């Protein structure tokens, strides 16, 4: 899970971790985890926090090493990124769905895809649109749009 973090996120977590490990022991007490998460904007109730700590503190030492800490924090950071991406895609879809009827035409989708990757040939675009608009309706709803933009379930 922690390999999904960017270098910037890892550096941010390292700084937060080090701030709570002033003796440089290489671990923080589990009691500090809630404090750090709330500083990162995540308020958790005691039961949820205890569950998360129990899951991450695999050796039950009451101490969280940096690796355990990044695994724990990655859940929140990656989740946040996914939510932010979803909101951005919703907004992008709304911009192209000018009539507000919940779908865009395949012509509009073609423009979007071309803007995202100008190396796509007309054949590439035709194949992609054929796959996306499997019912041949000439329209793409938000769910289909999301599948295209996020790579679907495969």
Swiss-Prot record:
Residue positions binding Ca(2+) 2: 133, 135, 137, 139, 144
Q: Where does Ca(2+) 1 bind?
A: 57, 59, 61, 63, 68
Indicate whether Repeat appears among the record's keywords. Answer: yes
Superkingdom as given in the UniProt entry: Eukaryota
Record keywords, A-Z: Calcium, Metal-binding, Muscle protein, Repeat
Looking at the UniProt entry, the stretches that span the membrane are none
Query: What GO CC terms are in its UniProt record?
Result: centrosome; cytoplasm
Tissues where the protein occurs: Present only in adult muscles.
Protein name per its UniProtKB record: Troponin C, isoform 1
**Gene this chain is encoded by:** TpnC41C
């Amino acid at each position: 899970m922690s390999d999904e973090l960017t270098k910037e996120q890892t550096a941010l977590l390292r700084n937060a971790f080090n701030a709570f490990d002033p003796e440089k022991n290489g671990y923080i007490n589990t009691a500090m985890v809630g404090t750090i998460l709330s500083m990162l904007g995540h308020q958790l109730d005691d039961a949820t926090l205890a569950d998360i700590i129990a899951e991450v503190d695999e050796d039950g030492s009451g101490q969280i090493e940096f690796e355990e800490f990044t695994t724990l924090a990655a859940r929140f950071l990656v989740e946040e990124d996914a939510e932010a991406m979803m909101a951005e895609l919703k907004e992008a879809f709304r911009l192209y769905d000018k009539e507000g009827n919940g779908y865009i035409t395949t012509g509009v989708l073609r423009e979007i895809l071309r803007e995202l990757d100008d190396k796509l040939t007309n054949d590439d675009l035709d194949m992609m649109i054929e796959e996306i608009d499997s019912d041949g309706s000439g329209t793409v709803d938000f769910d289909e749009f999301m599948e295209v933009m996020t790579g679907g379930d495969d």
